[in-house]
Amino acid sequence: HKIDYFVDSGTLLGAVRHGGFIPWDDDLDIAIRREDLPRLRKALQEELPSDMCYQDWTTEENYPMTIAKVRDKHSIFDESYYRMLKERGIYIDIFFVEPSLPLWLRKPIDYVYIRCIRGMNKFSDRFIEIFLGYLCYPITILIVDLVRLWGKLFHVKKLGRQYGWKSSLYVNENVIFPVSEIQYEGHKFYA
């Protein structure tokens, strides 16, 4: 499908430090360019075996994250954060990188975005959090869409995590792309 992916986060740390898993990280993490998400979503929804599923905010009403997951349907990974979801099996996290504002401008946007998502997705029984979630979410999405448009129009070459995720990632595009190979549990993956 010609989608550049690379191991990321704890998986990348484990590959560099241990050649594989690290004891305190219980999943696999990969990342892609956000612009590749629609193609990846379509490919995974059409081609995953029946015992696995693709999961994100477009496939599950109460999905509480701005990252995607590929889950095993025949397992249960009991995390309180995900108890309201239909599928809760073990998973691979799929993060996104996209053109980014400098961190000092991003942090307030991410903070509000995260609070809105949590308020809207039944993470709180407090009426005020739920109300503010629904009130501020459309405004936050508009701001994020404008920032993404700005990144495209001005060909921003600094990449950060997807909006709505606490992150300190803010690097030049050429630090990540083109991807290279790294050993992980005896296999080669892109990093």
Model-derived regions, located:
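Short hydrophobic/aromatic beta-strand micro-patches
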Residues: 31-33
